[in-house]
């Protein structure tokens, strides 16, 4: 009965699980080779990361970079965030 009510009322997903699902989709697209040198989603991913991090720490959006690097069969998604001195 509880699962039926959850289905009807809609159960909210946690932010972490949503982010995990998004990253899995992004990685799946990358592995299929659908995107060229730099994927179209990187700017959107960067904007979303700035929005989420800004909820907890005030950062300059220019101090967050997202970079995808490919080496042979390895893909590395690198995210660099420069935190203000008051947080460190």
Curated annotation (Swiss-Prot):
Task: Answer yes or no on keyword Cell cycle.
Answer: yes
Q: Which InterPro entries match?
A: MinE, MinE_sf
State the organism named in the record: Verminephrobacter eiseniae (strain EF01-2)
What is the annotated role of this protein in its UniProt record? Prevents the cell division inhibition by proteins MinC and MinD at internal division sites while permitting inhibition at polar sites. This ensures cell division at the proper site by restricting the formation of a division septum at the midpoint of the long axis of the cell.
Pfam families (UniProt xref): MinE
Alphabetical keyword list? Cell cycle, Cell division
Q: Which family does it belong to?
A: Belongs to the MinE family.
Q: Which Gene3D superfamilies match?
A: Cell division topological specificity factor MinE
Protein name per its UniProtKB record: Cell division topological specificity factor
Q: Does the keyword Chloroplast apply?
A: no
What's the gene? Answer: minE
- One BP term from GO: cell division
């Amino acid at each position: 009965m509880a699962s039926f009510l959850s289905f009807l009322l809609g159960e909210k997903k946690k932010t972490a699980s949503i982010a995990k699902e998004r990253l899995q989709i992004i990685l799946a697209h990358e592995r299929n080779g659908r995107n060229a040198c730099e994927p179209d989603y990187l700017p959107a991913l960067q904007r979303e990361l700035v929005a989420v991090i800004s909820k907890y720490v005030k950062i300059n959006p220019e101090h967050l970079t997202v970079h995808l690097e490919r080496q042979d069969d390895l893909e590395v998604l690198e995210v660099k965030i420069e935190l203000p001195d008051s947080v460190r």
